[in-house]
Amino acid sequence: MSSGGLLLLLGLLTLWEVLTPVSSKDRPKFCELLPDTGSCEDFTGAFHYSTRDRECIEFIYGGCGGNANNFITKEECESTCAA
């Protein structure tokens, strides 16, 4: 195979990897945790993955504590947990 063909194949494989959604078996276990507002009172918007709704949902986070199912952006939540 020519170097151009190998480069094209590499590009297609990379694109496939990026666009393939996370399957539930590959999803980190912490994505199954319920949202936890934490123990502080610096209330800001955050996102958690809802296994019931199968999407990332905004919730109010207190700013400290909580659990790992807590993301600053919806995009970060989706890339980590969404199937």
Curated annotation (Swiss-Prot):
It is found in: Secreted. InterPro entries: Kunitz_BPTI (IPR002223), Kunitz_BPTI_sf (IPR036880), Prtase_inh_Kunz-CS (IPR020901), TFPI/VKTCI-like (IPR050098). Disulfide bonds join C31-C81, C40-C64, C56-C77. The keyword Secreted applies. One of its GO terms (cellular component) is extracellular space. Residues 31-81 form the BPTI/Kunitz inhibitor domain. CDD domains: Kunitz_textilinin-like. GO terms for molecular function: serine-type endopeptidase inhibitor activity. SMART domains: KU. Belongs to the venom Kunitz-type family. Serine protease inhibitor. Does not inhibit plasmin, and does not reduce blood loss in the mouse tail vein blood loss model. This is Kunitz-type serine protease inhibitor textilinin-5.
